[in-house]
Each structure stands twice: as structure tokens, then as C-alpha cells.
Amino acid sequence: YEILRCLVGSEMCIRDRYYERINGQTVEIELPLEYPNSWILLRLKDVCQLTDGEKRNGKGICLDAKYLRSKSSASIVEKGKFVYAGDNIILVDGENSGEVFPVPQNGYMGSTFKQLWLSSVMWKPYILAFILFYKDELRNSKRGAAIPHLNKELFYNLPIGIPPLAEQQRIACQINNLFQLIK
């Protein structure tokens, strides 16, 4: 909570509830955090989506988790779901479901990934920091007995506070600075 106070600054508020229309009824939703009055509150599904990527044929690098973690060399595949350098992809199958990777070069996503589409009105590092904040919760609430899958219902329904863009940039910068101190 103190880190949140540090990141938000002096504009703390007592807004820890909001109302949402569900099946035609207005329901009060209790929130895990307090949000400043200048922020709007949405669900993660309103600012990001999991997509399949563009189906393509032709040789390209397979961007699987081992390669993205630098634990294996690149393998070449003939077709797949194409993503571009600078995109973000998220593991949706396996024990590390919810882990996000930046795409280092054009190539084909590994079969355990989805492309993470982020709204252009959002500051990408802010949303990525938000998803990272919930990494353990996403990892520990997987679905499926044989191969666990990302709980997409939980993922899409996470409440996210949306500050003005300049505040998103400041918060993301502060989070980055704090992570540098941890390293």
C-alpha cells in the first residue's frame, strides 16, 4: 500500500468501490485498492485483448518460451501465427501462464502463446507493469488439469485504474526505477 501511495502521489482518495451494470442490475464492486478521483476505472478487457496473430506461410523463427528466455537457439518453422518485433506475447498454456514477453524480432509465436493487443490510448509500460503486478495471481489461478491454462476470465476482469497519460508515464517510470534498485 505504501508503494501505491508513493506512485500515486498526494492525490489519494477514498474511492475503493465502484458500480457496474451486470445483467441489467447495478452492482457495487469492492476494489482491492483506492484510486484517485482523476482516474477512470475499467476492466483489463477494455484496454487489452488476447489475439491469435496473423496466420502466414513461409520460413520464420519460432518464438517459443525457451528461445525468448535465451535457453535455446532459434528454430525455423514453415508457417504459423506471425507477430512483429515490438509486439508483446503472453503465455496462455503451462506453468508460467500469464508471463509476458516482448517480441525481439519478426517471427511465429510458439503454440503456447497469444498476442497481447494493447489499446493505443494507453502507455504500454503502464499496462505491462499492471499485468506483472498480477503475475502470481494469474499463475496460481490456472484452469485445466492436464495442461494448466491462463484463467482468461480472471485476466479480462481485473479492474485497472486508468490515470491520465502523463501519470501513466510517470508511474511506469517510477516502477522501472524501483525495479532497478531491486536488481
Residue spans of the language-model regions?
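Single conserved hydrophobic/aromatic residue that forms the stacking wall/gate
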Residues: 1-9, 14
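Non-catalytic DNA-recognition/assembly elements of restriction-modification systems
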Residues: 5, 22-55, 67-68, 161-183
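Generic recognition of stable, solvent-exposed alpha-helical segments in well-folded globular domains
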Residues: 34, 39-43, 78-85, 122-129, ...
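Extracellular/lumenal ectodomain signal focusing on beta-strand-rich modules
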Residues: 46, 115, 157-159
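A short beta-sheet element
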Residues: 68-69, 79-132, 144, 155
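Specificity-determining recognition surfaces
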Residues: 131-160
